[in-house]
Regions:
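Donor nucleotide-sugar binding/catalytic pocket of nucleotide-sugar-dependent glycosyltransferases
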Residues: 132-192, 197-198
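Conserved donor-binding/catalytic core segment of Leloir-type glycosyltransferases
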Residues: 193-213, 219-222
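Nucleotide-activated donor-binding/catalytic signature segment of Leloir-type glycosyltransferases, i.e.
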Residues: 243-261
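Short alpha-helical donor nucleotide-sugar binding micro-motif in glycosyltransferases
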Residues: 257-258, 265-270
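Aromatic "clamp/platform" in nucleotide-sugar-dependent glycosyltransferases that forms part
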Residues: 278
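Short hydrophobic beta-strand element within catalytic cores of glycosyltransferases
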Residues: 295-298
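Conserved acidic donor-binding segment of nucleotide-sugar-dependent glycosyltransferases
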Residues: 310-311, 315-322, 331-336
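A short, well-ordered alpha-helix in the C-terminal region of glycosyltransferases
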Residues: 338-352
Length: 383
């Protein structure tokens, strides 16, 4: 087996999984990227720390079309993986060429956003509204071109699976997937301990300070719970303009950025992480929390919520519904012992989210005989 993986840019939550796949398959794995870095992610504090074994090759700016044709021809006998295939025009062209050449192609894809809120910022609102209208149309076109030509889709979240079925990809070609990061070495000697006499809730939010992330909904819920006394505190971490939110620096504090790679160690000191997104294709911060053994409350529009639901390591609330979120948090205030059980469940879920598990699962999918039952998903329930 030979594997070639194409990406707009390679980030840690993809590279760890590819390295695990390479180790599980004990085969050559070549990585091509359209960009070496993602400017928006860099502003958020992301750092690319690719393992030496991957050594991504940058697609040149000049002569890129001839370059990709040459690489596709040179790797005719390989399995071609396309991560976030519709994010970058060069990758779309490469994917269509690979499919037209009859190569064995798998997509690794989040769902497209069904809302108009910006993905990285809140600017260009009119353009974002137009994109929200056009996305379903574009994906139906992709489906018409690719449904019979690709071998499969690693669908990142149940919503991605639903969307790909909706554009004509056969259910037997869709394999549930996610994003994966390893457990921090700093946690090896740090086991979260529950305090049975402790009162109140200490919450953490990590994310870009934009409308899509739903921080305003979380702040409203915290304010509601603290009407008569200070029961809940919320620490907010992330890039963006904190002045647009109601942060009193008492119950709700802005704490700046977490140094890249330190999220799990920081999260471990909290009772729960909250991801109140209006939409999140996955939400890697959920992985970080579960790796740290910390329960998660997230909206029903966050892809990683499927993991929380299956492993019962937190709670799900209706997106944009502050009263529903308030009710879920209030249940934890009234029954703090439930958090202790959820911490254990979180650690179990975190173990399942290890990149090594994902790498072995990918290998099983790439190797399995379509006449046999598909490999079972280790992370969440899927029909």
């Amino acid at each position: 087996m030979k594997i070639v993986s194409w990406h707009p840019v390679l980030t840690d939550h993809q590279s760890y999984t590819l390295e695990a796949l390479q180790q599980a398959a004990t085969c050559p794995l070549t990585v091509y990227v359209a960009k070496a870095e993602h400017p928006a992610r860099q502003l958020q504090g992301w750092v690319n720390r690719h393992t030496a074994s991957l050594s991504p090759q940058l697609i040149p700016q000049k002569g890129w079309f001839k370059y990709i044709v040459r690489q596709l021809r040179a790797h005719r006998d390989a399995i071609h993986l396309f991560g976030s295939p519709f994010e970058q025009p060069k990758l779309i062209v490469t994917l269509l060429l690979a499919a037209a050449m009859g190569l064995r192609v798998f997509l690794i894809s989040e769902p497209y956003s069904p809302i108009s809120a910006g993905y990285q910022n809140d600017r260009l609102k009119l353009i974002n509204r137009a994109k929200a209208v056009l996305r379903p149309v574009l994906y139906r076109c992709y489906g018409a071109l690719l449904s019979r030509r690709i071998a499969g889709v690693f669908a990142i979240s149940p919503l991605a699976a639903i969307q790909y079925r909706g554009i004509g990809i056969a259910g037997k070609k869709i394999f549930p997937f996610g994003y994966f990061v390893p457990r921090s070495e700093r946690l090896c000697s740090k086991t979260p301990a529950a305090d049975s006499e402790k009162t109140g809730l200490k919450l953490i939010f990590i994310g870009t300070l934009i409308e899509r992330k739903g921080l305003d909904v979380l702040i409203e819920a915290v304010r509601s719970l603290n009407r008569t006394e200070l029961l809940v505190t919320l620490d907010v971490y992330g890039s963006g303009d904190s002045s647009q939110f109601d942060l009193d620096q008492a119950a709700v504090r802005y704490c700046g950025l977490i140094p890249f790679g330190e999220a799990q160690a920081v999260i471990a000191d909290y009772d729960a992480l909250v991801l109140p997104s209006r939409y999140d294709g996955w939400g890697v911060v959920v992985n970080e929390a579960l790796m740290a053994g910390v329960p998660v409350i997230c909206s029903d529009r966050a892809g990683a919520g499927a993991v929380v639901e299956k492993w019962q390591c937190g709670a799900i609330f209706a997106s944009e519904d502050a009263p529903d979120l308030t009710g879920k948090l209030n249940e934890w205030l009234r029954a703090p012992e439930s958090l202790a059980k959820m911490r254990l469940a979180a650690r179990n879920a975190g173990a399942a989210l290890d990149p090594d598990v994902a790498g072995r699962y990918m290998l099983d999918v790439l190797s399995f005989d379509t006449k046999q039952p598909a490999p079972s998903c280790p992370w969440y329930d899927y029909d």
